[in-house]
From Swiss-Prot:
GO molecular function: histone H3K4me3 reader activity; methylated histone binding
Encoding gene, per UniProt annotation: Spin4
Origin: domain of life: Eukaryota
Assembly, per entry: Interacts with C11orf84/SPINDOC. Associates with chromatin.
Protein name according to UniProt: Spindlin-4
Function comment: Binds to acetylated and methylated histones, including H3K4me3 and H4K20me3, probably acting as a histone reader that recognizes chromatin marks to mediate downstream cellular effects. Promotes canonical WNT signaling, and is involved in the down-regulation of cell proliferation.
Region Histone H3K4me3 and H3R8me2a binding: start-end pairs: 80-85, 128, 237-239
Spans annotated as Tudor-like domain 1: 41-90
GO terms classed as biological process: gamete generation; negative regulation of cell population proliferation; positive regulation of canonical Wnt signaling pathway
Stretch list, region Tudor-like domain 2: 119-168
Region called Tudor-like domain 3, residue ranges: 201-246
The organism's taxonomic lineage, starting at the top: Eukaryota, Metazoa, Chordata, Craniata, Vertebrata
Amino acid sequence: MSPPTVPPTGVDGVSAYLMKKRHTHKKQRRKPTFLTHRNIVGCRIQHGWKEGNEPVEQWKGTVLEQVSVKPTLYIIKYDGKDSVYGLELHRDKRVLALEILPERVPSPRIDSRLADSLVGKAVGHVFEGEHGKKDEWKGMVLARAPIMDTWFYITYEKDPVLYMYTLLDDYKDGDLRIIPDSNYYFPAAEQEPGEVLDSLVGKQVEHAKDDGSKRTGIFIHQVVAKPSVYFIKFDDDIHIYVYGLVKTP
């Protein structure tokens, strides 16, 4: 898991509240196809990744979503990476030789009632660190992930980015517990009776970092189970950030 990061303290006129948790007969195999601009949601992909002067890495993963308010942006879960990435796969020059793989995404049966019962809940999630030491990270289960049926979107207080884990086994094994007060660090949005809150999805956002520089981004998703919570994609970062937003006077 990535180490905790220091999150922004505010987003464009609203206060931000944090949330955060691996010599025989051979069958002829279909070769990967080089990608054209087709619908790739649900596809398994692979490509090279070249960051600055670093060596090229090979990444392989599943395309989960195409962002409706920014269609060039895709949400991807890469194998071996816990956090979810947002990339403009056809435009980002760091993405090299993008290919579709002939693999299918497995669809195992799960306990849908139990899975749905976890969504929107504040949780304590136990991870095992070095030397077998266990550490509980408090966070919130945001949604069941698309495409990959046994996975969940989740975020943590210690690191307010979007993660994906298969949580049902952890819950059954006692490594995931539900915290009764789901508003303890994600306050509910203040709302007058009958008031309909405007969605921020598609709106641009700007915030000042600690060093005085500014970063810009876009609200890409509103969490159905917690409408005061949004996913934000900043232009200078491939991670998806998660914030609970409340109106300020």
